């Protein structure tokens, strides 16, 4: 079930251009859609976030570096670890301009929070999951590196008890999901660039996104792959 509406453009823009943008800013953007945030009593070990992480009804929007080059990210495999239940083994690929690189790594979910919604929904419970990621571009090719940072997922428990991707507020201006923010460090030069990607929005991307209700790239970045 989804709810579609547009909040003021000023609200999301002020969050997007605030410097520096932090993981806390992302959390506040999502939780602003809800009445209350509180500790979650569910067990991370008993929850399987694979269907949330592999949700493919929408593609990632991502950017890298000071010029906000378009970053394409695709997960091809995610498996919950049998011995460490908060850890997920990840495989996928990235593309910047014409360079496509395979990666493998991990996502670790370490915190759950429950979100209280006053709207009528089909969910027993809604919340966010927070964690860390580390992805290694492992091929013997130029322009490879290490991605690392933090991840934020919006989830929901259905009335049937299933853990689902939460798109209830899709269409709301501040909404995004499956957000990753952090750095990419070149293996060749050891130089680090800021990186971020998510569904529907590019988190912490400054003036890249000028859209209200949907992502629209700023014209000055079109030459960087947008």
Role assignments for model-derived ranges:
Residues 100, 113, 190-192:
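Residue-level signal for secondary-structure boundary sites
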Residues 187-188, 198-206:
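Long, charge-rich, low-complexity intrinsically disordered regions
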Residues 87, 94-108, 115-125:
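Mid-length scaffold segments of soluble, non-membrane domains
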Residues 20-76, 85-95, 125-139, 143, ...:
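Tryptophan-anchored aromatic micro-motifs
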Residues 1-23:
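Bacterial Sec-dependent N-terminal signal peptides
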Residues 39-44, 67-75, 106-120, 142-169:
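Charged, amphipathic alpha-helical segments
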Residues 13, 169-172, 181:
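Active-site/pore-lining binding-face segments in mid-to-C-terminal subdomains
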């Amino acid at each position: 079930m989804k709810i579609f509406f547009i909040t003021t453009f000023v609200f999301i823009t002020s969050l997007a251009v605030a410097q520096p943008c932090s993981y806390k800013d992302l959390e506040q953007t999502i939780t602003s859609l809800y009445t209350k945030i509180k500790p979650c009593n569910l067990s991370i070990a008993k929850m399987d976030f694979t269907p949330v992480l592999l949700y493919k009804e929408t593609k990632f929007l991502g950017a890298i570096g000071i010029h906000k080059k378009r970053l394409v990210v695709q997960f091809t495999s995610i498996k919950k670890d049998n011995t460490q239940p908060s850890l997920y083994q990840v495989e996928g690929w990235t593309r910047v301009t014409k360079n496509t690189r395979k990666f493998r790594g991990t996502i670790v979910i370490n915190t759950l929070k429950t979100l209280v919604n006053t709207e009528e929904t089909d969910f027993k419970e809604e919340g966010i999951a927070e964690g860390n990621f580390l992805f290694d571009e492992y091929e013997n090719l130029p322009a490879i590196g290490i991605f690392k940072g933090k991840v934020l997922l919006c989830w929901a428990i259905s009335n049937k008890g299933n853990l689902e991707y939460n798109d209830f507020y899709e269409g709301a201006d501040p909404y995004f999901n499956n957000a990753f923010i952090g750095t990419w460090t070149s293996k060749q030069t050891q130089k680090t660039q800021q990186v971020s990607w998510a569904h529907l929005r590019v988190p912490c991307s400054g003036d890249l996104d000028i859209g209200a209700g949907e992502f629209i790239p700023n014209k000055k970045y079109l030459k960087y792959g947008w």
